[in-house]
């Protein structure tokens, strides 16, 4: 099926280049501008030579960097930290920079809280993400995906398009906007806002802290206005659930609703977008895996989706803060220290995956930590993300089975999100 404009295929299972430890600098944006192969090689070196190491915080304009952090790179350690929130606390922040009052205004949601309050807040919306409820919206997901792929074909008679703007971006965005009750006319605004929030630091998206804070205020004000409307006009949507919920006998404040809203639309959009895009890139590089999946789509879909999430590792890391002194692998860390959990590294750990460099759509077992390491903060939207990924690839298989990337992706300059800004594709 080869299209002559496709990017170069690769030999599946090829390990990344060796990167000496002296060439690794997690605390520099220059390191995060390097391509994925170098990044993978760097983390392989860290797992082998310095599985726990200390790094300075990247300086971003407007953000308070604060102290450096201990980087956990081994799957077992990331898993352990995820399962012990009493020691590795999500409070006060999940990114390495310090939380400030102005940031907490918009990013103080349940993701930066611990139980019991975290669990009470999570329970408000968790019902909307159960397998049963997600199965109910299957038809809506499929309809959206079908229309997006059909439009992609209709709007591009030259059979050249950007996968991110035409499918991988709009699909999860439209679904989470539907669930939140956001009108279609506002979807593009939401898309822009989430891009700025998660793309801050990338010159193509936003490097002006004032713009970042303005966008945060805009999305917060939008959420508050939508919530105020729902206080009067009940809808069968997640925003109404937030407005009507009681936690510890109290309704959520407008500020709590706004930060909750930001979490759901940002998390519910960016991560799935990048998993789908990395998946198409991987199928382009390893076409034998695509042939294998297309020949038994339903049979392989469950393991294929998990492997795409492992391969993509859309969230690169999360930060925790130690509540007590602890020693891991002979490294002493003190109460109050920042600890970073590197999912991108845990998902390539040679001690956990026999062949971590092989993109294997039938991989089973697959103990990846792409949705977090389990425990209290396991990704709330995992069921929805799996459904969206599966349906997106099913529609590609049906409508443009030989879709292939034509250029290397434009990568997001970010330490936190494994993002792709554009991925040009073609089909016959």
UniProtKB/Swiss-Prot annotation:
Superkingdom: Bacteria
Name of the gene encoding the protein in the UniProt record: cyp124
GO biological process, one term: fatty acid omega-oxidation
EC numbers for this chain: 1.14.15.14, 1.14.15.28
Catalytic activity: a methyl-branched lipid + O2 + 2 reduced ferredoxin [iron-sulfur] cluster + 2 H(+) = an omega-hydroxy-methyl-branched lipid + H2O + 2 oxidized ferredoxin [iron-sulfur] cluster; cholest-4-en-3-one + 6 reduced [2Fe-2S]-[ferredoxin] + 3 O2 + 5 H(+) = (25R)-3-oxocholest-4-en-26-oate + 6 oxidized [2Fe-2S]-[ferredoxin] + 4 H2O
Any GO molecular function: NADPH binding
Function as written in the Swiss-Prot or TrEMBL entry: Primarily hydroxylates the omega-carbon of a number of methyl-branched lipids, including (2E,6E)-farnesol, phytanate, geranylgeraniol, 15-methylpalmitate and (2E,6E)-farnesyl diphosphate. Also catalyzes the sequential oxidation of the terminal methyl of cholest-4-en-3-one into (25R)-26-hydroxycholest-4-en-3-one (alcohol), (25R)-26-oxocholest-4-en-3-one (aldehyde), to finally yield the carboxylic acid (25R)-3-oxocholest-4-en-26-oate. Also able to sequentially oxidize cholesterol itself, not only cholest-4-en-3-one.
Family: Belongs to the cytochrome P450 family.
Pathway this chain belongs to: Lipid metabolism; branched-chain fatty acid metabolism
Protein name (database record): Methyl-branched lipid omega-hydroxylase
UniProt cross-references to Pfam families, sorted A to Z: p450
